[in-house]
Regions:
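Bacterial N-terminal signal peptides that target proteins for export
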Residues: 1-9
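Bacterial N-terminal signal peptides
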Residues: 8-18
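Short S/T/G/P-rich N-terminal loop/turn motif that feeds into the first structured element of a domain
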Residues: 23-318
Length: 318
């Protein structure tokens, strides 16, 4: 029986990894002359490169996949969206990840520097008739593979985050922990997380995480994102638990347990694997690991050679 949730104890937070794609804070290219579009796209790329830390706003689309429709079947469907964005040279990127625990589902995460930047990106897509039409068509095809779909919008909380990096280029797995807070207990939750941060600092663990507050799409919840370059880093996280507990001490553990009981209504941790075939990564990720981010398309099965008819059997003489 767990007396303290793994979220607050940092069991699922000891990682070496990163947060999300840098976001854009200017309007995406619309129907303009090619020179104007190119200038605007270059400006947005420069701003993306200059942004440090996680984006302020995350827009997450969650797709629930029908049994038997995941894997290569869903990859092929999602690649249509990726190809459409690449053809339009769209400067807003997103990362896809598939569940390794819980219900079969996929997440598509896009980062923005602000809500205003998100609005401008949506408006620009609407004005790009060719891209809009292609995305609408692809949505119909993809919808046939899904059991359901929902969306959420998160807002970054730097005070509750701990050493959040800036790139997913070398990350392969994502641990996502959702903590639902009891009404009126935000202060207790903040105090608990800050205790966890201090204990990780004192214990010298490898922990890193980014925390986002659920802005739209649910209740009073916080989401922890912890990135892993490999599953070996998950092993490291559990192995470092003793460092964390020793740094916290018996009195600290007791206080943390009391805070958790006071403020946490429920918590859940799930593991996801990043899927490059369904992602539209920024150029710097691709340059960092081109073999991962530009996987070869699955080859179609080779055609079987035509079967030659067997010669007619000779009839014995009568």
């Amino acid at each position: 029986m767990k007396i303290v949730s793994p979220v607050l104890l940092g069991l699922s937070l000891a990682v070496v990894g990163s947060s999300f794609a840098a976001a854009q804070d200017t309007q995406s290219p619309q129907t303009q002359n090619p020179q104007m579009q190119n200038q605007q796209m270059q400006s947005m790329k420069m701003q993306s490169m200059q942004m440090q830390g996680p984006p302020k706003v995350l827009q997450i689309t969650r797709e629930f996949i029908k049994p038997g429709k995941s894997g290569a079947i869903h990859d092929k469907s999602e690649s249509n969206f990726v190809q459409a964005m690449a053809k339009a040279k769209w400067p807003t990127h997103y990362v896809a990840m598939n569940s390794l625990s819980g219900k079969l589902r996929a997440l598509y995460i896009t980062g923005y520097a602000s809500f205003d930047a998100w609005e401008k990106d949506n408006a620009a897509i609407d004005k790009n008739k060719a891209l809009s039409a292609e995305l609408d068509k692809d949505s119909v095809t993809d919808g046939e593979l899904l059991d359901g779909i929902d969306q959420a919008v998160l807002y970054y909380d730097p005070d509750l985050s701990y050493r959040p990096p800036t790139s997913l280029a070398n990350v392969r797995f994502m641990e996502i922990s959702v903590v639902k807070i009891k009404p009126g207990h935000r202060k207790d939750f903040s105090d608990a997380v800050k205790m966890v941060i201090d204990a990780n600092k004192k214990g010298g663990t490898s922990s890193q995480w980014a925390v986002f507050e659920l802005a739209y799409g649910g209740g009073d919840e916080y989401v922890f994102f912890s990135a892993d370059k490999s599953m070996a880093e998950i092993d490291t996280g559990y192995a470092e638990d003793k460092k964390f507990r020793d740094a916290l001490g018996d009195d600290g553990l007791k206080k943390l347990t009391e805070l958790e009981q006071a403020c946490v209504d429920s918590s859940d941790s799930e593991l996801f694997q990043i899927n490059p075939r369904q992602s539209y990564p920024p150029d710097d990720w691709v340059k960092a690991d081109p073999n991962f981010w530009t996987p070869k398309a699955a080859m179609a099965p080779a055609e079987k050679p035509a079967v030659k008819p067997l010669p007619a059997a000779k009839m014995p003489p009568r």
